[in-house]
Amino acid sequence: MSELYHPVKIGNVELKGNLFLAPVAGYSDAAFRSVCIENGACFTYTEMVSAEALVRKNLKTEILMRRACNEKAYSVQIFGGEPEIMAEAAHIVLEKTHCEVIDINCGCPVPKIIKTGAGSALTRDPDRLFKVAEAVVKAAGGR
C-alpha cells in the first residue's frame, strides 16, 4: 500500500482509505456520490444543506441528504449561522439519515451564504463558530 493511500479513522468511523469526495454544491447528490464510490472514493459528503430549510421541513432539502445505495459511510454537511437552528438541524439530520458524520460548513465564500453569518463568515467570528459547533455536538449526543 502506498504511503499516500492509507486507512483513516474519524471518531469511531474506520475507513479503508483516505480518498474523500468533497462537498460540492449542485454536484454532490446521491447519484454522483455513488459513481464516485464505484471509482474509489472511500468517504463522501453531501452538498451543503441549509439548516434553516431543514428546520422548515423543506422536502427538496431533505432529498439532498439521502444516502446512496452503495454508501457505507458518509457525511451530511450543514450550513447556518445560528447555534439553535444548527442544533435542531443536526438532530433532524441524525433522525432522518443516520449518517456517520455531520460536517459544519465553514468555508463557503458565496455572498448569499456569508451575509447570513454562515459559511466562511463563521471563521471571522470565532465565538459564534464555537457556539455553533458546541450546539451541533450537543444535539448529536457528543458523537
Cite the ranges covered by each PLM segment.
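A short acidic, helix-capping loop that chelates divalent metal ions and anchors anionic groups
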Residues: 54, 110-116
